[in-house]
From Swiss-Prot:
Family according to the record: Belongs to the bacterial ribosomal protein bL27 family.
GO biological process: translation
HAMAP family noted in UniProt: Ribosomal_bL27
Segments for region (Disordered): 1-22
A Pfam family annotated for this UniProt entry: Ribosomal_L27
Gene: rpmA
GO cellular component: cytosolic large ribosomal subunit
An example molecular function term from Gene Ontology annotations: structural constituent of ribosome
InterPro entries xrefs: Ribosomal_bL27, Ribosomal_bL27_CS
Keyword Transport: no
Name of the molecule in the record: Large ribosomal subunit protein bL27
NCBIfam families for the chain: L27 (TIGR00062)
PROSITE patterns membership: RIBOSOMAL_L27
Protein's organism: Allorhizobium ampelinum (strain ATCC BAA-846 / DSM 112012 / S4)
Length: 90
């Protein structure tokens, strides 16, 4: 015969895995082609010069250079890669 009442089971304890979204390379950081700069849902950041955008809106570098962020007058933030000059590379 049981001497303790059976405990109820909790119906909580489920959650989805985090998607690790956000900025991966900040302004001034050096990137090489293929480096992911921003992972996002939708276009919180927009692609500028020397960057591409994947089908999931991921912004990635197309050339080697420094990452820059620029806000236009309409409030949109554009991510660009400023290529390294020949003198700076030597």
């Amino acid at each position: 015969m049981a001497h303790k009442k059976a405990g109820g089971s909790s119906r909580n304890g489920r959650d989805s895995e985090s998607k690790r979204l956000g900025v991966k390379k900040f302004g001034g950081e050096v990137v090489i082609p293929g480096n992911i700069i921003v992972r996002q849902r939708g276009t919180q950041w927009h692609p500028g010069a020397n960057v591409g955008m994947g089908k999931d809106h991921t912004i990635f570098a197309l050339t080697t250079g420094n990452v820059t962020y620029r806000t236009k007058s309409n409030g949109r933030v554009f991510v660009s890669v400023m290529p390294k000059t020949a003198e700076a590379a030597e």
